[in-house]
Amino acid sequence: MVREKIRVSTRTLKWKCVESRADSKRLYYGRFILSPLMKGQGDTIGIAMRKALLGEIEGTCITRAKSEKIPHEYSTIVGIQESVHEILMNLKEIVLRSNLYGTRDASICVKGPGCVTAQDIILPPSVEIVDNTQHIANLMEPINLCIELKIERNRGYHIQTPNNFQDASYPMDAIFMPVRNVNHSIHSYVNGNEKQEILFLEIWTNGSLTPKEALHEASRNLIDLFIPFLHAEEEKENFHLKNNKKKVTLPLFTFHEKLAKLRKKKKEIALKYIFIDQSELPPRIYNCLKRCNIHTLFDLLNNSPDELMKIKHFRIEDVKHILDILEMEKNFA
């Protein structure tokens, strides 16, 4: 029986921004590549990333407007060129940038004649306007226009339910998606005897964040979605261990002795400049450490085993794994 050798890929995935431009204040474009990928991985990543970019990133919108002078949505106001419906549509198009949580109040209060634009909106400190020139209304006469606004941060697309305007407020359908469009394409090539792929990812945003920022946030959101599956598997393993009469009890490791030995050598090497991604840590451990702002070996050694065990999804085997890797490093020999 002849067995074929199994090719183990030792490639390192790399991504790069190959094109970036701002077509306008409300239209940014970015083109990225990721390679080298094995056959089929391009679609796997591209489809997941497209869904995450369009559906998992939060944005900020005006979701409600209120004015005492407006009898109903399709009415007109004397002295204003636009109808109430047109004004609401213009407010809906305003692009906002924020890090707020929940709902905030904003307002417009201007006196005509003149042009009302986005710069006339009085915003809370946590919100800013991407394009101050966005048009809202034209006041043709010396009248006052006062509108109370509700601003909300959310994700996806929300269709508001009409409230019959009993409180003189008008709910607006909100498109919270800061990413306007995403395309992915795949270029296949042969490297030796192995078929590989390059993933091309094109991202258009509304200016509230750059395509690079959108890519980063979508990646983080995907990681957050997959972590529970890993945790569930760990719980399943622990359950089997508890119910297994032949289970092996993990030995107690002399964490403090090992860490104390490593800490004594702190002054001999530039620990602050050795990043944890330079060590061969499994992705799950690496992500757990990064989430707790542990970026270097200096940061890592400043945490006791008890502190490391408090990290969400962290296990006792992970601490042992970290110590084993550190002891294998030449600098810690």
UniProtKB/Swiss-Prot annotation:
EC number per UniProt: 2.7.7.6
Q: Does the keyword Nucleotidyltransferase apply?
A: yes
Q: Which GO terms describe its cellular component?
A: chloroplast; DNA-directed RNA polymerase complex; mitochondrion
Q: Write out the entry's keywords from A to Z.
A: Chloroplast, DNA-directed RNA polymerase, Nucleotidyltransferase, Plastid, Transcription, Transferase
Please state what class of enzyme this protein is.
transferase
Classification via SUPFAM superfamilies: C-terminal domain of RNA polymerase alpha subunit (SSF47789), Insert subdomain of RNA polymerase alpha subunit (SSF56553), RBP11-like subunits of RNA polymerase (SSF55257)
Single GO MF descriptor: protein dimerization activity
Where are the residues of the annotated region Alpha N-terminal domain (alpha-NTD)?
A: 1-233
GO biological process assignments: DNA-templated transcription
Keyword check for Cell wall biogenesis/degradation, yes or no. no
The listed locations are: Plastid, Chloroplast
Q: Which reaction does it catalyse?
A: RNA(n) + a ribonucleoside 5'-triphosphate = RNA(n+1) + diphosphate
Pfam families according to UniProt: RNA_pol_A_bac, RNA_pol_A_CTD, RNA_pol_L
Give me the ranges of the annotated region Alpha C-terminal domain (alpha-CTD): 269-333
Q: What is known of its domains?
A: The N-terminal domain is essential for RNAP assembly and basal transcription, whereas the C-terminal domain is involved in interaction with transcriptional regulators and with upstream promoter elements.
Subunit field text: In plastids the minimal PEP RNA polymerase catalytic core is composed of four subunits: alpha, beta, beta', and beta''. When a (nuclear-encoded) sigma factor is associated with the core the holoenzyme is formed, which can initiate transcription.
- What's the family? Belongs to the RNA polymerase alpha chain family.
* PANTHER family the record matches: DNA-DIRECTED RNA POLYMERASE SUBUNIT ALPHA
Q: What does this protein do?
A: DNA-dependent RNA polymerase catalyzes the transcription of DNA into RNA using the four ribonucleoside triphosphates as substrates.
Q: Which NCBIfam families match?
A: rpoA
Protein name per the record: DNA-directed RNA polymerase subunit alpha
Question: Origin organism of this chain?
Answer: Cucumis sativus (Cucumber)
